C-alpha cells in the first residue's frame, strides 16, 4: 500500500528469513482505504502460490490493528452476506434508550445480544458476523478463527487437543456497511475473475473459459439464488435460500445436475397429476352435490 498504513504485514517485527521470503512470494495487486467514523479500514488484494486473497485490516484511533484473511470465494460470500445485513439494518428503526440498555451487557456499555447473526465455515477457518448495538451505536462485528491442528473447536486456547488460533475481530460501524460492501464488490469484480480458487486453475472446470450467469427467483417471502462456480474439484451450482431471518445454501456438483434436474421434473409432473386428480374429484363431488339438490326439488 502506497501510504504504508495497509492491513498487509508491514511495520511489525522482521521475523527473519521466513518473513522476508513470505514478503517476496506474496504480491499486492490492489488496495483500498476507507475512513468510517474514527476508524480506517484497508482492503488489500494479494496473490501468492496458493492463489488470490483479500486481507482486511481495521486500524483504530490508537493505531492498533486487527486483520482478517479471505479467499476470493469467501470474499464473494461475504459480499452477499453484507447485502443481507444492509437490508436488515435498513429495516431497523431508531433505538430507544430502553432498547440500548437492554442490548448492552452492563456498566461498560458492551454489546450483549446480536440484532442479526450469521456464520460461515470454509476449510480451516470460521467467520462469525454479528450486528450489534451499544451506547455508541450499531456495528457489524466480524470475527475469524483459524484451525491450526487437530481438535478444531475442542479444548480451545491452543491447549492439548485444541487447535484454534486466537481469533481476529474487526468492528464495522453500521453507517459504513454499504461503502464497505461496494468497495469489496469492486475488488472482487476487478480481481476475482482470474483467481485460481474461483476458476479452479489450469485444467479445472473442464477447461471452460466461461460459466453461466447467476440468477434468482422470488417465492413468497423467500428468494432463491443460483450461482455457478468452479474450484479445483470442478464446476458446481450453489443454491441459496434467503429469508429476512436466515440464509441457507447447498452445493451441487456439475455431474449431478442432470440427476437433480430429472428429479425436479419428475416431481413436478407427479404433483401436476396429483393436482389434476384432486381437481377432478372436487368437480365430481360438486356435480354429485348439485344432482342431489335437483332430486330433492
Swiss-Prot record:
Chain spans, region Disordered: 1-26, 275-297
InterPro entries in the record: PUR-bd_fam
Keywords, sorted A to Z: Acetylation, Activator, DNA-binding, Nucleus, Repressor, Transcription, Transcription regulation
Parts of the chain that traverse the membrane: none
Region DNA-binding, residue ranges: 23-246
GO biological process: positive regulation of transcription by RNA polymerase II; regulation of transcription by RNA polymerase II
Regions of compositional bias (Basic and acidic residues) in chain numbering: 275-288
GO molecular function per UniProt: DNA-binding transcription factor activity, RNA polymerase II-specific; DNA-binding transcription repressor activity, RNA polymerase II-specific; purine-rich negative regulatory element binding; RNA polymerase II transcription regulatory region sequence-specific DNA binding
Residues modified to N-acetylalanine: 2
Pfam families to which the protein is assigned, alphabetical: PurA
GO cellular component, one term: nucleus
Primary localization: nucleus
Positions in coiled-coil regions: none
Function recorded in the entry: Transcriptional regulator which can act as an activator or a repressor.
Full protein name: Transcriptional regulator protein Pur-beta
Organism in which the protein naturally occurs: Danio rerio (Zebrafish)
Amino acid at each position: 500500500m502506497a501510504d504504508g498504513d495497509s492491513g498487509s504485514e508491514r511495520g511489525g517485527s522482521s521475523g527473519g528469513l521466513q518473513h522476508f521470503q513470505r514478503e517476496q512470494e506474496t504480491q499486492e495487486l490492489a488496495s483500498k482505504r476507507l475512513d468510517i467514523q474514527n476508524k480506517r479500514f484497508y482492503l488489500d488484494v494479494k496473490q501468492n502460490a496458493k492463489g488470490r486473497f483479500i486481507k482486511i485490516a481495521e486500524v483504530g484511533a490508537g493505531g492498533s490493528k486487527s486483520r482478517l484473511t479471505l479467499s476470493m470465494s469467501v470474499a464473494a460470500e461475504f459480499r452477499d452476506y453484507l447485502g443481507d445485513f444492509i437490508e436488515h439494518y435498513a429495516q431497523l428503526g431508531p433505538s430507544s434508550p430502553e432498547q440500548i440498555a437492554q442490548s448492552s451487557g452492563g456498566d461498560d456499555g458492551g454489546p450483549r445480544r446480536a440484532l442479526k447473526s450469521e456464520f460461515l465455515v470454509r476449510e480451516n477457518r470460521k467467520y462469525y458476523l454479528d450486528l450489534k448495538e451499544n451506547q455508541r451505536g450499531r456495528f457489524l462485528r466480524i470475527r475469524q478463527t483459524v484451525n491450526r491442528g487437530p481438535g478444531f473447536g475442542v479444548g480451545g486456547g491452543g491447549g492439548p487437543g485444541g487447535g484454534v488460533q486466537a481469533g481476529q475481530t474487526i468492528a464495522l460501524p453500521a453507517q459504513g456497511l454499504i461503502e464497505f460492501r461496494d468497495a469489496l464488490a469492486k475488488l472482487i469484480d476487478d480481481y476475482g475473475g482470474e483467481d485460481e480458487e474461483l476458476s479452479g486453475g489450469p485444467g479445472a472446470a473442464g477447461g471452460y473459459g466461461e460459466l453461466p450467469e447467476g440468477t434468482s427467483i422470488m417465492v413468497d417471502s423467500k428468494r432463491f439464488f443460483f450461482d455457478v462456480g468452479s474450484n479445483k474439484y470442478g464446476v458446481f451450482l450453489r443454491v441459496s435460500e434467503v429469508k429476512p431471518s436466515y440464509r441457507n445454501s447447498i452445493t451441487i456438483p456439475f455431474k449431478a445436475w442432470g440427476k437433480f434436474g430429472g428429479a425436479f421434473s419428475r416431481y413436478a409432473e407427479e404433483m401436476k397429476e396429483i393436482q389434476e386428480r384432486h381437481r377432478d374429484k372436487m368437480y365430481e363431488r360438486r356435480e354429485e352435490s348439485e344432482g342431489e339438490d335437483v332430486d330433492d326439488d
